[in-house]
Every structure is written in C-alpha cells, then in structure tokens.
From Swiss-Prot:
Main location (coarse class): cytoplasm
Subcellular location: Cytoplasm
UniProt name for this protein: 3-methyl-2-oxobutanoate hydroxymethyltransferase
Molecular function, one GO term: magnesium ion binding
HAMAP family associated with the record: PanB
Subunit structure, as described in the record: Homodecamer; pentamer of dimers.
A GO BP annotation: pantothenate biosynthetic process
Pathway given in the UniProt record: Cofactor biosynthesis; (R)-pantothenate biosynthesis; (R)-pantoate from 3-methyl-2-oxobutanoate: step 1/2
Length: 275
C-alpha cells in the first residue's frame, strides 16, 4: 500500500476492505481529523490511511465550546473540501448533533455526506442506533459507530469523563458493540475508555476498531489534528501527544504519528486510562 520512499505516500486507494484486511493482518490503522484540502493533501503524503472530517471542527475551527452547534451543512462543506484535497485516504464524516435522531432523517443526511465525498459516516450512540445503522447499511452507506465518551452527549455525561470503568459499564459497552455490529456497523470507534477494555472489545468484534484515549490494543488510532500539532485552547487531553516537536514541520509530524502508531509506541501507557 505504501511506496518505498521515506514519505510513505499511499500508492492506491484505501477502502473498507483494506481496513478489514489490516485488522486481520494486525497492521495498525492510522487516522487523523482534517477539515480542508491542504492538510488532507499533506496527510496523504504522510501515509495516513483514514481521515475523519470530525464535528470537532465546531471547537477547533469555529471556536464553539462543544460540537453541538455544528450543522449537517457545516459537515457537508468541510467533507467536500477534504475530498478535493484527497487522493487515496479513506474519508469518514461525522453526522452532526440531531441529524440522525430518526432513521429516515439519518438516511437523508447520510446521503448528503456521501454525495459531498465521504466514504463512510460516523454516528454517536449505543444500541438505540441499531435500526438506523441497519437502514443505512441496507441502502449501501458504510457506518462507523462511536461508543464510549460521545461528545454530543457531553451534557448528559456531566463533562468529558472516562467511560466503561465499572464492570457493569464495561459489559454494557460490549453488548452495545455486538448489537451495532449485528445491525451492520463496519467500524467501531471507542473514545476515553480503559486500556484493557479497549483490548476486550477489539478482540470481541469482527470489524476494525479505532481508538482515541482507548489504549494501544485497538486496531487503529485517531487524534484531532490540532491536538497532535499542539494547537489547542489551553487544555491538552491525557491521550494526546504533540508530534510537532523536535523541529519537525507538519509533514514530518504526520509521518512521526504514522510511524509511532505502526510501531505501537503510541499511544504509550501514559496516554491511557485504568479501570
């Protein structure tokens, strides 16, 4: 999949089949958020296999205090921009808050994101999403289900807190994972869960798992681009590492991230959570 040059540029398109094979081969999957054409192009050069057009743009681009104000129109705009800068990476696009509260509504909005250039849509939630995921899957729309800490539910959680710490909570996450895979989810993304739970869940499901603050056992890793470049508003989550250090430029920072995820040196123990 990679060329022989030091930049590890992707030489052919990454597909869902590619990601499933990477899980089977135990090759780590790399993912970063991007919101425009320019950074997307650099990520392709650096060899990042998957790009997430995240609703995190509400915070890092728009300056909001959460992801809730982001609209489906915002997501379509940025997905189209990312598509224009992309060559071979696999593009995931977030469905914004309340854009998938009903299955038919979700289908309409997911179609907009796919038409804008997404290869897959991502939804936050548990087993209640099963009917929605089943409908999207039946209509040919690949789905990534986001479990654990789901930022669109931040007010219900009472803040950005680690999820799945108790045995009951861990058991619930496992059951929800199995329910959503049975409904047709093609990828599961876990956020802010204990490292060992990340391993349990990854071993239990047949689809690729991507983690952010979920330890090193998940099949892949994702970070918000601004966080891993040290561009933030004063708060750096525990699971983040600044790769724009040691005199690196942006391309080198992305390359270092890819290398450390592949080598399984990132995330380290200091980036994970305990039960």
């Amino acid at each position: 999949m990679y060329s022989d040059n030091s930049q590890r540029k992707l030489t052919k398109a990454v597909t869902l089949s590619t990601l499933k094979k990477m899980k089977a081969d135990k090759e780590k999957i790399t993912c970063l958020t991007s919101y425009d054409a320019s950074f997307t192009n650099v990520m392709n050069v650096a060899g990042v296999e998957t790009i997430l057009v995240g609703d995190s743009l509400g915070m890092v681009i728009q300056g909001q205090d959460s992801t809730l104000p982001v609209t489906i129109e915002d997501m379509c705009y940025h997905t189209a921009a990312v598509k224009r800068g992309n060559t071979n990476a696999f593009i995931l696009a977030d469905m914004s808050f309340m854009s998938y509260s009903k299955p038919e509504q979700a289908l309409d909005n997911a179609a907009k994101l796919m038409q804008a250039g997404a290869n897959m849509v991502k939804l936050e939630g548990g087993s209640w999403l099963a009917d929605t995921i089943k409908l999207l899957s039946q209509r040919g729309i690949p789905v990534c289900a986001h479990l654990g800490l789901t930022p669109q539910s931040v007010h219900k959680f009472g803040g950005y807190k680690v999820q799945g710490k108790s045995q009951d909570a861990a058991d619930l996450l496992l059951q929800e994972s199995l329910d959503l895979v049975a409904a047709g989810a093609d990828i599961l993304l876990y956020e802010c869960i204990p490292t060992e739970l990340g391993k349990t869940l990854t071993d239990a499901v047949p689809v690729p798992t991507i983690g952010i603050g979920a330890g090193h056992h998940t099949d892949g890793q994702v970070l918000v681009m601004h966080d891993m470049l040290g561009i933030n508003l004063g708060h750096t989550p525990k699971f983040v590492k600044n790769f724009l250090t040691e005199g690196r430029n942006v391309t080198e920072a992305f390359e270092a991230y890819v290398k450390e995820v592949k080598d399984m040196t990132f995330p380290g123990p200091e980036h994970g959570f305990k039960s």
